[in-house]
Curated annotation (Swiss-Prot):
Protein name: Zinc transporter ZupT
Signal sequence, start to end: none
Function: Mediates zinc uptake. May also transport other divalent cations.
Intracellular or extracellular location(s): Cell inner membrane
GO CC terms, sorted: plasma membrane
Biological source species: Escherichia fergusonii (strain ATCC 35469 / DSM 13698 / CCUG 18766 / IAM 14443 / JCM 21226 / LMG 7866 / NBRC 102419 / NCTC 12128 / CDC 0568-73)
Keywords, in A-Z order: Cell inner membrane, Cell membrane, Ion transport, Iron, Membrane, Metal-binding, Transmembrane, Transmembrane helix, Transport, Zinc, Zinc transport
C-alpha cells in the first residue's frame, strides 16, 4: 500500500477519534474545537497558496493559463457543489436544545452524515493527490483534514448516542463520513495511479489547491466562529500557518522537503 493512500486512510479515520470522545464522555470544549478548525484552515491555506499552486505552475509544460485556470475551476467547483449538496453541518446537531426522539435524531443524523460525506469526498482526493506529488505537503494536508474530522465525528456521534444509548450506532454513523474521504483517496489511487504525465498531475494539484482554499474560507473558518462566537478563529488560522510554515522550513533545511 502506498504512503499517500495510508495518509488518506489515517486522515479519514480521525473521525473515529471524535466519535469515541463522544461516547466516552470526554468532549473537548467549544474553544478547543474552534481553534482546531482555524488551525486546520491555516495549514490548508498556507500549503495551497504557498506550496501547491507554485509547485504546479513550476512544472515543465504547465502554462500559467492552465495552472490558474485549474485553480479557479477548483474554487468554483467547490462552491458549486457546496450550494447543490445538502447543507448540513456538525453544529446542526451540536446546537439542539431539546432532546429529540431517537427516530427524529436518526433521520437528522442520516441527512447530516450524507451532507458531510459528500463534502468530505474531495478531501480524500486532495490528501492523496498532494501526498503523491509531495509527501511533505501531503502530511500537512492529512493533519489538517484529521483535525477537521475530529469535531465532525464528535458532533455526529454525541447526539446519536444520547438519543439511542448505543455506542455502536453512534460510532457507525460518525464513521460513515470518514469513510467517504477514504473512498475518495482509494478512487484517486485507482484512477490517477495510471497517469504518469507530470502536467496532468500538476493540473490536478492546482485544482485541489483551489478546493482547499474554498474549503478553508467557506467551511472551516465560519464553522469555527459558529462553534465559539466569543473568540476570533483568526488566531487558530495564524497559528496553523505559522506552525506549518516553520515545519516546512525545518524539513527543507534538513533536506527532507
Amino acid at each position: 500500500m502506498s504512503v499517500p493512500l495510508i495518509l488518506t486512510l489515517l486522515a479519514g479515520a480521525a473521525t473515529f477519534i471524535g466519535a469515541f470522545l463522544a461516547v466516552l464522555g470526554q468532549k473537548p470544549s467549544n474553544r478547543v474545537l474552534a481553534f482546531s478548525l482555524g488551525f486546520a484552515a491555516g495549514i490548508m491555506l498556507l500549503i495551497s497558496l504557498m506550496e501547491m499552486l507554485p509547485a504546479a505552475l513550476a512544472v515543465e509544460g504547465m502554462s500559467p493559463v492552465l495552472g490558474y485556470g485549474m485553480f479557479i475551476i477548483g474554487l468554483l467547483g467547490y462552491f458549486g457543489l457546496d450550494r447543490m449538496l445538502p447543507h448540513a453541518h456538525p453544529q446542526d446537531l451540536m446546537q439542539k436544545t431539546q432532546q429529540p426522539l431517537p427516530k427524529s435524531i436518526r433521520r437528522t443524523a442520516i441527512l447530516l452524515t450524507l451532507g458531510i460525506s459528500l463534502h468530505n469526498f474531495p478531501e480524500g482526493i486532495a490528501t492523496f493527490v498532494t501526498a503523491s506529488s509531495n509527501l511533505e505537503l501531503g502530511m500537512g494536508i492529512a493533519l489538517a483534514v484529521a483535525l477537521h474530522n475530529i469535531p465532525e465525528g464528535l458532533a455526529v456521534a454525541g447526539p446519536v448516542y444520547a438519543a439511542t444509548g448505543s455506542k455502536r450506532t453512534a460510532i457507525f454513523w460518525a464513521g460513515i463520513s470518514g469513510m467517504a474521504e477514504i473512498l475518495g483517496g482509494v478512487l484517486a489511487w485507482l484512477i490517477l495511479g495510471s497517469l504518469i504525465s507530470p502536467v496532468v498531475m500538476a493540473a490536478v494539484m492546482a485544482a485541489v489547491a483551489g478546493i482547499m482554499v474554498a474549503l478553508s474560507v467557506d467551511e472551516l473558518m465560519p464553522l469555527a466562529k459558529e462553534i465559539d462566537p466569543n473568540n476570533n478563529p483568526s488566531y487558530g488560522v495564524l497559528c496553523g500557518m505559522s506552525v506549518m510554515g516553520l515545519s516546512l522550513v525545518v524539513l527543507q533545511t534538513a533536506g527532507i522537503g
